[in-house]
């Protein structure tokens, strides 16, 4: 770490653009520009922002059956996903390079190399040099997410070294997996990213716990989603009728390494949460607790992580 001045970071609570990938990419570009002009050096967007998190949709499924209309809607969702690399990725590379920022964006990724049907919930890392530096695929989709997303493997437990410290993180309820969190801590993450689709109040306790446990800064980031944001011509839109008008109230927030609130949670609107991080607070906070250092017991506990890529056919 060579830069000891405060580091401004931004967590973007963007309004959802379901089934409208081009608009989502343009939102990434415009809100990145806004955050960069405010001095942000690291900018985080929510889980599944580009490609969409389909709140409230069941895609016409029930135990033991699927519907033709559900298949059509999944086809439309698949078309909303992006290839990595691909033209949408190139556009986000460009905006990161134009503004010289570290940019992290949640996307829905198509796997066109090994499968033409499987989607992944992915976090992309872009550098200020305008390059895609890496990606993380969600290891375990939650509940009905398993219907539409595949599972990532250990090869994308990505972290990125910046000039102000190592950045990495996990997506949504992966953050309830203790061994996954420990893997991030073991990689030396100082700024921990936790993009999510969970807008419950209690999610704030999770973010605060991660900050205290890892003695790291934590950026929690969610979308603001209203039923009216879905396209009018969406088939099976009646599946949304059982849900409230506001599908995700947000809750984007930033916490410090002693669990202190640095960026208050933002609710019921789109916006950007900022914080200025004193990176020296990391080692000061670890004076009495260092989860992979003096508070670890490798003689009692060990964690083995398989970071190899897994394919159905070798």
For each predicted feature, which ranges?
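N-terminal glycine-/serine-/threonine-rich phosphate-binding loop
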Residues: 1-42
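Hydrophobic/aromatic beta-strand patches that form the interior of the parallel beta-sheet core
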Residues: 10-12, 44, 104, 134, ...
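Cys-nucleophile CN-hydrolase/nitrilase-fold catalytic domain and related Cys-dependent amidase chemistry
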Residues: 21, 33-128, 198-200, 204-216
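Short beta->alpha transition motifs characteristic of CBS
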Residues: 51, 58, 124, 136-140, ...
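Active-site catalytic loop in hydrolytic enzyme cores
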Residues: 81-94, 99, 109-190, 195-209, ...
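Short, basic/aromatic recognition patches
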Residues: 93-94, 100-113, 221-224, 229-243
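Short beta-strand scaffold segments in enzyme catalytic cores
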Residues: 105-107, 121-125, 158, 220, ...
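C-terminal beta-strand edge segments of enzyme domains
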Residues: 223-314
């Amino acid at each position: 770490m060579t830069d000891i001045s405060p580091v401004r970071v931004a967590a973007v609570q963007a309004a959802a653009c379901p089934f409208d990938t081009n608009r989502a990419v343009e939102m990434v570009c415009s809100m990145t520009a806004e955050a960069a002009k405010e001095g942000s050096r690291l900018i985080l967007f929510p889980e599944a922002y580009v490609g969409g998190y389909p709140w409230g949709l069941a895609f016409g499924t029930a135990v033991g059956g699927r519907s033709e209309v559900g298949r059509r809607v999944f086809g439309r969702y698949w078309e909303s996903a992006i290839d990595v690399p691909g033209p949408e990725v190139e556009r986000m590379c460009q905006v990161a390079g134009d503004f010289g920022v570290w940019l992290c964006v949640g996307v829905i990724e198509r796997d066109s190399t090994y499968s033409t049907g499987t989607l992944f919930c992915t976090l992309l890392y872009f550098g200020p040099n305008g390059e895609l530096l890496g990606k993380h695929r969600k290891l375990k989709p939650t509940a009905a997410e398993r219907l539409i997303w595949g599972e990532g493997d250990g090869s994308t437990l990505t972290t990125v070294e910046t000039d102000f410290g190592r950045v990495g993180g996990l997506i949504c309820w992966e953050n309830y997996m203790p061994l996954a969190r420990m893997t991030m801590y073991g990689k030396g993450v100082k700024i921990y990213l936790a993009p999510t689709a969970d807008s419950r109040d209690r999610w704030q306790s999770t973010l605060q716990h991660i900050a205290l446990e890892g003695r790291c800064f934590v950026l929690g980031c969610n979308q603001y989603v209203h039923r009216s944001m879905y396209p009018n011509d969406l088939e099976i839109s009646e599946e949304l009728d059982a849900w409230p008008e506001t599908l995700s109230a947000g809750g984007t927030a930033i916490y410090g390494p002693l669990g202190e609130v640095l960026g208050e949670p933002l609710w019921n609107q789109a916006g950007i949460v900022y914080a200025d991080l004193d990176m020296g607070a990391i080692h000061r906070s670890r004076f009495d607790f260092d989860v992979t250092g003096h508070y670890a017991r490798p003689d009692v506990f060990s964690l083995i992580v398989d970071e190899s890529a897994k394919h159905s056919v070798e």
